[in-house]
Design a protein with these regions (language model features):
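Carbohydrate-binding surfaces in secreted/extracellular proteins
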Residues: 86-123
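Flexible glycan-contacting loops in extracellular carbohydrate-active proteins
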Residues: 119-145
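Acidic/His-leaning functional-site neighborhoods
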Residues: 64-74, 101, 118-124
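Extracellular structured ligand-interaction cores
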Residues: 32, 94-96, 105, 133, ...
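Predominantly extracellular/luminal cell-surface or secreted proteins
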Residues: 8-10, 109-113, 152-154
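Extracellular beta-strand elements of beta-rich domains used
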Residues: 147-151
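Short, aromatic/His-centered strand-loop micro-motif at the edge of beta-sheets
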Residues: 70-96
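Secretory/extracellular carbohydrate-interaction modules
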Residues: 1-72
């Protein structure tokens, strides 16, 4: 199961992909990743939960910086580092996730199953984003449960 958090997401700014992504959510009913990375200006943190016998894929935590103005799709959007085979996520286990974006630094903290780990991503090589919406996305063929979802903004 792949889950994605979009942080400060905005549209590309051209019709129909106006800055406020809520205004074109109908266009995202068909789950095509290219609809997101070609038309959203955003930070993205994703994590994959494995453990499905029919899949031989590594568990991962990674981040990207979507930049539709570059017109390169996903090419060159990776934030470093990437974390593979963390051993964290197990199917059926509840986790508490905390995401922090400060300036061009992204953090993801995972607590659960007796573990507490924090992951860091450096976005300083990319244009900074300072406004936009927060969004969730997951593979449409999978299930995840979300509870107590909150967004905070710190005063400067």
């Amino acid at each position: 199961c792949v889950n994605i958090l979009y942080i400060q997401a905005q549209g590309a700014g051209r019709k129909p992909f106006v800055k406020d992504i809520f205004k074109w959510n109908e266009l995202r009913k068909v789950p095509r990743m290219s609809m997101y990375f070609n038309n959203m200006d955003t930070y993205h943190i994703s994590y994959a939960v494995t453990g499905v016998a029919s899949e031989d894929k590594p568990e991962y935590i990674r981040a990207r910086r979507y930049m539709p103005q570059w017109e390169k799709g996903l090419e060159g959007t990776e934030l470093k580092p990437e974390y593979l085979n963390t051993g964290l996520f197990k199917i059926g286990v509840t986790y508490h996730l905390t995401f922090i974006k400060y300036e061009t630094n992204l953090y993801m903290n995972v607590k659960g199953d007796g573990q507490d780990k924090t992951f860091y991503f450096d976005a300083s090589a990319f244009p900074k984003i300072d406004k936009g919406r927060v969004g969730l996305r997951q593979m449409y063929t999978r299930n995840s449960k979300y509870a107590n979802f909150r967004v905070y903004q710190l005063d400067k």
